[in-house]
């Protein structure tokens, strides 16, 4: 189909949608589009998976459980399922992971950016398998949340504001290649030499560090202005 051709160069992963909500001991997975084993799946209705307390990480996975070659088409049988094995096989993708204490509720609303990686009782999206043009990607929801928090910062530099708008205006997730370029430029403090190749939780931690730096004015326009004023005073 035209849609399969449009996304033929994308790797396996979530391409759009699949937003998560937790209520009544159920994880609700919204409509979306997923590529798995080089086939595009359109999820047109909400799916639900019941969850229970777990003292170790449990992964919510999208899984192809059966593939049948018929005379004129291929039929797939798929499922969303919880698995305490975090490793993925070729027919699996991770949607999220979590640890849940007995008596606690699972949260999909976050207090702040760092909260996405809170150890217990929170849906963790940092290691979800997302797909973008150009390669694998960090969750669109994670990068959008990062962008919104950057735009709340008065000290944000123009380049951070521009990148935040780029993330928010992108209809799809942004590849790790682009994200790593931004991380490298920020980490090198203007001396762009290193090449970063981080994914998942490590990429999330880098963005968390950058956001904290922006919030504290570690590399802000305000600091640049202060340095210039001090130089003017010295010259006088």
Language model regions located:
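N-terminal "first-domain core" detector
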Residues: 1-45
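Beta-strand-rich solenoidal segments
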Residues: 35-236
């Amino acid at each position: 189909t035209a849609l399969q051709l449009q996304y033929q160069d994308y790797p396996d992963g979530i391409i759009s949608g699949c937003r998560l909500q937790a209520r009544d001991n159920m994880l609700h997975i919204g409509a979306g589009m997923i590529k798995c084993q080089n086939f595009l799946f359109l999820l047109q209705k909400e799916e639900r998976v019941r969850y229970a307390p777990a003292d170790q990480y449990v992964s919510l996975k999208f899984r192809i459980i059966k593939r049948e070659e018929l005379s004129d088409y291929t039929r797939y049988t798929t499922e969303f399922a919880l698995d305490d094995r975090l490793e993925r096989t070729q027919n699996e993708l991770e949607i999220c992971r979590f640890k849940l204490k007995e008596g606690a509720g699972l949260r999909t609303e976050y207090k702040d950016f760092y909260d996405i990686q809170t150890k217990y009782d929170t849906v963790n999206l940092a290691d979800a398998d997302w797909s973008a043009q150009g390669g694998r990607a960090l969750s669109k929801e994670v990068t959008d949340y990062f962008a919104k928090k950057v735009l709340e910062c008065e000290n944000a530099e123009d380049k951070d504001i521009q990148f935040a708008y780029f993330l928010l205006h992108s209809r799809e997730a942004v590849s790790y290649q682009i994200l790593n370029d931004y991380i490298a430029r920020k980490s090198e403090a203007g001396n762009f030499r290193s090449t970063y190749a981080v994914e998942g939780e490590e990429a999330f931690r880098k963005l968390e560090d950058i956001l904290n730096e922006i919030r504290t004015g570690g590399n802000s326009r305000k600091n640049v202005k202060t340095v210039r004023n001090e130089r003017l005073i010295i010259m006088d």
